[in-house]
C-alpha cells in the first residue's frame, strides 16, 4: 500500500548560488558526508546537489512532515544501490516518522527517482508498505 508520495522541483541556479555564497556552511548543514563526497567529485556540482536537495524535500513531503516535527535535512541521505539506482537512507527523526507510518506486519520500501533538465532538478518519492513475509 502507498503511505506517502512527494515531489519537488529545485532551481539548480538557486543551489549554485548557495554553494557560491555559503560554501561549506550550506553543504554541511543540508548534506551528509557521503552526499558531499559524491557531489564534490563531479565537474558540475550544482545539478548533483540540486537533485539531492529536491530528493530531501520530496521525502519530507512523502513523510507528511515537511522539514518539521523532528525531521532534519541530514536525516535523509540519497544513496545508490549496487545497481546504481538511487534510494534514500533515513535516520533520526525521519526514520522515526517512517516507523510511525508503517502498519504492524509491514515493512517500508522507499522509491526515489531523480532527474534534471537545467535549470531545474526534480525528485519523486514514494513510500510503500509491503507485508512482511518469511522470505523478506
Curated annotation (Swiss-Prot):
It is found in: Cytoplasm. Its main location: cytoplasm. SUPFAM superfamilies: 4'-phosphopantetheinyl transferase. One of its GO terms (molecular function) is holo-[acyl-carrier-protein] synthase activity. Mg(2+) binds at residues 8, 57. Belongs to the P-Pant transferase superfamily. AcpS family. Transfers the 4'-phosphopantetheine moiety from coenzyme A to a Ser of acyl-carrier-protein. This is Holo-[acyl-carrier-protein] synthase. It comes from Methylorubrum extorquens (strain PA1).
Amino acid at each position: 500500500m502507498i503511505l506517502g508520495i512527494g515531489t519537488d522541483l529545485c532551481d539548480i541556479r538557486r543551489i549554485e548560488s548557495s554553494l557560491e555564497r555559503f560554501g561549506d556552511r550550506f553543504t554541511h548543514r543540508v548534506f551528509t558526508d557521503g552526499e558531499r563526497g559524491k557531489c564534490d567529485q563531479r565537474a558540475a556540482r550544482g545539478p548533483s546537489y540540486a537533485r539531492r536537495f529536491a530528493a530531501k524535500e520530496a521525502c519530507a513531503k512523502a513523510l507528511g512532515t515537511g522539514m518539521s516535527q523532528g525531521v532534519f535535512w541530514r536525516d535523509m541521505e540519497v544513496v545508490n544501490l549496487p545497481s546504481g539506482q538511487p534510494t534514500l537512507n533515513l535516520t533520526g527523526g525521519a526514520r522515526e516518522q517512517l516507523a510511525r507510518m508503517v502498519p504492524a506486519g509491514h515493512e517500508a520500501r522507499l522509491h526515489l527517482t531523480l532527474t534534471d533538465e537545467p535549470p531545474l532538478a526534480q525528485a519523486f518519492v514514494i513510500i510503500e508498505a509491503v507485508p512482511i513475509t518469511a522470505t523478506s
